[in-house]
């Protein structure tokens, strides 16, 4: 049955949005010809998601309306509130009782940025008594660190439009010895602080997927899954990653 739905969705994708216009299936995903897309306002997430959203909207013949959330916590809290028609963000932030997610679209490495003058030869060396690890409050990195860190202290700061600079300032002031975040923040933070460096390895991975609100039909789920997979297969995702100059993202 699942394969049949995907085949039907693939056939629909081959027809332009104008051609199948406001069918019940398209209307189920984009009511009234408008596609509201929930995203997180950070380059490695929203910056890559926007071209994917534009691709999906074009295929559906729908006008895209970005719904940008300022931080991961606000994005998480949006589920179940009918604020968007589809969402594109970390899989871990899409509650399974409130949304149905597609396959993964891209993956983001979680990295540590070490403050100048510190010695952390590898990931394992970070979790020691007396070490302070900075991170973004409520982000997937925060979830991983909260679960895995046993001895070090976690110092949380809010996500902001200047988060890489904020992370660098935290390290510069030695309020943190390392900063753990997605690579979209980690590498720019390291570049912003002379003497800072990326600790070899990754302490986790953030998987990004699209999601529909719970309760949409299997056919609508299959259509969205097919559209975002086409965006991945045709290079829309990779071009967005390359255009933003992101490292540790694939």
Label each PLM-derived region with a short phrase:
Residues 73, 88-98, 144-147, 172-204:
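A ligand-binding cleft/hinge motif common to bilobed small-molecule-binding domains
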Residues 50-59, 124-132, 139-140, 209-250:
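Extended ligand-binding regions for polar small-molecule ligands
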């Amino acid at each position: 049955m699942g394969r049949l739905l995907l085949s039907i969705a693939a056939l629909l994708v081959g027809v332009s949005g104008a051609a199948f216009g406001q069918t019940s299936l398209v209307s189920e995903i984009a009511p009234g010809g408008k596609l509201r897309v929930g995203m997180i306002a950070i380059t490695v997430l929203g910056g890559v998601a926007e071209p994917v959203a534009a691709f999906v909207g074009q295929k559906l013949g729908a006008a895209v309306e970005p719904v940008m959330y300022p931080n991961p916590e606000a994005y998480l809290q949006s589920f179940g509130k009918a604020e968007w028609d589809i969402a594109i963000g970390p899989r871990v932030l899409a509650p399974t009782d409130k949304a149905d997610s597609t396959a993964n679209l891209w993956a983001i490495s979680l990295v540590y940025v070490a403050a100048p003058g510190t010695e952390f030869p590898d990931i394992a060396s970070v979790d020691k008594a007396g070490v302070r690890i900075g991170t973004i409050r409520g982000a997937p990195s925060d979830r991983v660190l909260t679960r895995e860190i046993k001895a070090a202290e976690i110092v949380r700061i809010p996500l902001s439009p200047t988060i890489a600079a904020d992370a660098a300032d935290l390290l510069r002031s030695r309020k943190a010895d390392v900063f753990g975040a997605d690579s979209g923040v980690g590498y720019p933070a390291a570049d912003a602080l002379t003497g800072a460096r990326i600790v070899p390895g990754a302490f986790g991975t953030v998987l990004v997927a699209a999601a529909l609100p719970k309760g949409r039909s299997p056919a609508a789920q299959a259509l969205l899954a097919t559209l975002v997979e086409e965006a991945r297969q045709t290079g829309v995702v990779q071009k967005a990653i390359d255009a933003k100059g992101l490292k540790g993202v694939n």
